[in-house]
Amino acid sequence: MEIKIYNTLSRKKEPFKTLEPGKVSMYVCGPTVYDKAHVGHAMSALVFDIVRRYLEYRGFEVKHVTNYTDVDDKIIQRAMVEGVDSMEIAQRYIDEFDQHLKDLNILPASEYPRATEKMTQIIEGVADLIDKGFAYPKDGDVYYRVNKFPGYGKLSGRKIDDMEAGFRIDVDQRKEHPMDFALWKGAKPGEPSWPSPWGNGRPGWHIECSVMSHTCLGEQIDIHGGGNDLIFPHHENEIAQTEAMFGKQFATYWMHNGMMQLSGAKMSKSVGNLVTIDSFLEKHEAAALRMMILNSSYRSPLTFNEETIEHAQKALKRLRSALRPALPKDGWGSAAKLEDQSVKAKESFLAAMDDDFNTANTMGHLFDFVKT
């Protein structure tokens, strides 16, 4: 049996073939650490924990990297409000998220790089893009030339001309093209900054991930993952940067999980419709959140409400009730039948998981087996 993965880049399921036989390199975008994490963040972490666990079950050696964005406008704003250093804010919420990962029984990543730890490499990456004509400095900032990269828009399916139409008003006149994006931002009073050839400043969000992925996993990776809200502009821009730097396809497979929804809308800090991981774990066990995800398709939106939580709790209870010695009731005939059913259940499990990690079907087969 071969594993098939839905690739956002091709918009279809593809046979899974790794760059190096038996090994998987996987980069998953982590949180921007400026506030308490919510169950939407947990969903992405759990989805790729499930992916990793299955790949390892199938015999692959997985190197899994998840980053922390620890320099960002939102972190800086939070620090100003509290009157503390931005690194104090970042460390506070990194520590909290690390604990949440343990509470949720998520396997530790191979590495957890931070943007501030890769500043030398980030500056070198920006300089390389300038040297190759893909970027240009302007008044202390550095911008990426989207028109220079012929594949821009291939992940999201957008065309530059169509995107430009939405940027007719309040366009930064320093940009050569309205869709050009910042690789480096010149320093502002009171903000953290680092010295660079273009003056003191800090990196843009997108270049951070390109560089962290490269320094941890190399020029090419097997899987790049994250929430589907990151497809554009973040992952689109990562492709443009990384492939411009190295002249190779960046990631073979782009995997995106759906969003956790509350009251019919994406769970978001900016909107305010969220449930923190802390508050969830005060009322429910961690396994219930994992079961909610297992009962659904990872690429689809997941509604968070009392009904879905209760359904997950009942499913857990059913599984736990089956965790006892299977004693045949009718002699050896029943034992042989049970063994045959267990073989078929495993085959169904593998077939479902090989089909783009179809955990919903997997759980269906598992519950059918539990009934026996």
Regions found by a protein language model. Give the residues of each.
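Active-site pocket-lining segments that scaffold enzyme catalytic pockets across diverse folds
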Residues: F97, K102-P108, V126, I130, ...
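Short, polar/flexible loop-turn hinges at active-site or ligand-entry regions and domain interfaces
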Residues: E82-E88, A109, R299-T303
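Short catalytic-loop micro-motif centered on adjacent basic/acidic residues
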Residues: H64-V65, S110-P113, H224-G226
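Alpha-helical recognition segments enriched in aromatics with Gly/Pro capping
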Residues: M1-Y34, D49, T120-L327
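N-terminal, positively charged nucleic-acid-binding surface of large information/translation enzymes
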Residues: S10-K13, L19-N105
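Short, glycine/charge-rich beta-strand/loop segments that flank catalytic centers
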Residues: Y68-D72, I94-F97, L107-I122, G140-F149
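Helix-loop elements that line ligand-binding/catalytic pockets
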Residues: L302, T308-T372
